[in-house]
Amino acid sequence: MLVIFLGILGLLANQVLGLPTQAGGHLRSTDNPPQEELGYWCTYMESCKFCWECAHGICKNKVNESMPLIIENSYLTSCEVSRWYNQCTYSEGNGHYHVMDCSNPVPHNRPHRLGRKIYEKEDL
């Protein structure tokens, strides 16, 4: 009975958050989340490479138009994300994980912002 209740709760959380309910609301670990979920994933971990489109060393955020252009550097990390019921996980591949309730997300951007270099025209 508890399992059924938790399953229903997980599906409801996905609907509230606007996340697709594919495969019962689960998302296997991937470094390429579905396009329609980028808004969610990139809000809480903006340094993931899949959130940025880079050309010639200059990167533009795919989701947030107000983000400044940045220089491609170590700020961008290779992330994998996954979702199992109401647990959303970011893995940076170096043993660092950020786990949060999908319905109560907590940004994990601060540690990476220190390495971000905003693009200035003089950088060319």
Swiss-Prot record:
Induction annotation: Expressed in the early phase of the viral replicative cycle.
Signal peptide: 1-28
The keyword Signal is assigned to this record: yes
Coiled coil ranges: none
Keyword hit for Glycoprotein: yes
Compartment(s) of residence: Virion; Host endoplasmic reticulum-Golgi intermediate compartment
Motif (Prevents secretion from ER): 121-124
Entry-listed glycosylation sites: 64
Keywords: Early protein, Glycoprotein, Signal, Virion
Pfam families for this protein: v110
Domain of life of the source: Viruses
GO CC terms: host cell endoplasmic reticulum-Golgi intermediate compartment; virion component
Family the entry assigns: Belongs to the asfivirus MGF 110 family.
Function as written in the Swiss-Prot or TrEMBL entry: Causes the redistribution of lumenal ER protein to an enlarged ERGIC compartment.
Protein name according to UniProt: Protein MGF 110-4L
Organism encoding this protein: African swine fever virus (strain Badajoz 1971 Vero-adapted) (Ba71V)
